[in-house]
C-alpha cells in the first residue's frame, strides 16, 4: 500500500471509529477533514501512523498496516495526564 492510500485509510478508519464512539446526544459527527496524521513511517511492506482528531476528547490513535496479511490494526488511547519531569543533565 502506498503512502497516499495508507493516509486515506487511516483517516477513514479513525473518523468512523470516533463517530461510532461519540456521545450520540451531542449530535456531533466528524469526517476525514477532522482527522490528522501526527507521525507516520513505512518499513518494507508495513506502515504505522499516530493519528488524532480536532475533537477535544483527548483521544489518540495508533494504526498499523501489516502488508503481509493485508490487515490494519487500530489502537485507541485516551490521554490521562501530561506532566513535566526535570532531568538533570
Place the predicted regions along the sequence by residue.
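Amphipathic, interaction-prone secondary-structure segments
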Residues: 34-71
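N-terminal non-globular leader segments, chiefly Sec-dependent signal peptides
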Residues: 1-44
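A short, surface-exposed interaction/processing loop segment used at functional sites
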Residues: 69-89
Amino acid at each position: 500500500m502506498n503512502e497516499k492510500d495508507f493516509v486515506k485509510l487511516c483517516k477513514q478508519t479513525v473518523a468512523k471509529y470516533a463517530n461510532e464512539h461519540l456521545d450520540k446526544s451531542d449530535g456531533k459527527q466528524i469526517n476525514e477533514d477532522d482527522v490528522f496524521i501526527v507521525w507516520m513511517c513505512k518499513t518494507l511492506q508495513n506502515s504505522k501512523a499516530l493519528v488524532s482528531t480536532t475533537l477535544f476528547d483527548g483521544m489518540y490513535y495508533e494504526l498499523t498496516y501489516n502488508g503481509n496479511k493485508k490487515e490494519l490494526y487500530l489502537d485507541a488511547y485516551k490521554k490521562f495526564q501530561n506532566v513535566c519531569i526535570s532531568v538533570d543533565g
